[in-house]
Amino acid sequence: MSGGGVIRGPAGNNDCRIYVGNLPPDIRTKDIEDVFYKYGAIRDIDLKNRRGGPPFAFVEFEDPRDAEDAVYGRDGYDYDGYRLRVEFPRSGRGTGRGGGGGGGGGAPRGRYGPPSRRSENRVVVSGLPPSGSWQDLKDHMREAGDVCYADVYRDGTGVVEFVRKEDMTYAVRKLDNTKFRSHEGETAYIRVKVDGPRSPSYGRSRSRSRSRSRNRSRSNSRSRSYSPRRSRGSPRYSPRHSRSRSRT
């Protein structure tokens, strides 16, 4: 997931474009950017604020995977008392269409469930701070290779699945006992170990709440399939504080 900022350029395809409705009457383009910038580089924001009708907007990302994350993370988001409606335009794709991007594809998934693309190359992570989200964990573990699934649980543990076994092995060797930083700036040293026989509890009772309310938006637990691989080396940490004026 790349950095924020609006990049003006030629229009892309509908996979990168999302619809944002139920906006407050005094909404500005900059406010919309503040709500969505953390999901990735924004190519364009087209705010429609016609007199006599409620405002709405189209936001276009550089990467279709960032658009998918924005739909999942911000649909139903409470912005100054307005519950945002965020979806792909009806002329484009639907949110239930494939399980990810990056050339990997994937099986269809439910809107609120993780993608069906899974891997046996799984590690268990412990010692996560309370504000650590699946996206924070995924970003941290990408230093080892291509992550196809990540999730976090209430007890400070998480699971990460890699596309390749060698990346899983590398993650245990290089990321065990490293400093983890959440999007809220909390830090902790985490432990990374190869998972044993799969526990049926993962992904159910121990999963963090998927509440989409303003004060729990960090807990949206959904993984997009396949992630671009970063070069191996020392992990990079960049806390992502939301600049939205809708704060807790």
Curated annotation (Swiss-Prot):
Biased composition (Basic residues): 205-248
Gene Ontology annotations for the cellular component aspect, listed alphabetically: cytoplasm; nuclear speck; nucleoplasm; nucleus; spliceosomal complex
Keyword Transferase (UniProt): no
Post-translational events: Phosphorylated by CLK1, CLK2, CLK3 and CLK4. Phosphorylated by SRPK1 at multiple serines in its RS domain via a directional (C-terminal to N-terminal) and a dual-track mechanism incorporating both processive phosphorylation (in which the kinase stays attached to the substrate after each round of phosphorylation) and distributive phosphorylation steps (in which the kinase and substrate dissociate after each phosphorylation event). Asymmetrically dimethylated at arginines, probably by PRMT1, methylation promotes localization to nuclear speckles.
CDD domains referenced in this protein's UniProt entry, alphabetically: RRM1_SRSF1, RRM2_SRSF1
UniProt region (Interaction with SAFB1), positions on chain: 198-247
Residue numbers carrying N-acetylserine: S2
Pfam families attached to this UniProt entry: RRM_1
Name listed for the protein in its UniProt record: Serine/arginine-rich splicing factor 1
Chain segments carrying region Disordered: 88-134, 191-248
UniProt-recorded Gene Ontology molecular function terms: mRNA binding; RNA binding
UniProt lineage: Eukaryota, Metazoa, Chordata, Craniata, Vertebrata
Source organism per UniProt: Pongo abelii (Sumatran orangutan)
Intracellular or extracellular location(s): Cytoplasm; Nucleus speckle
GO BP terms: mRNA 5'-splice site recognition; mRNA transport; regulation of RNA splicing
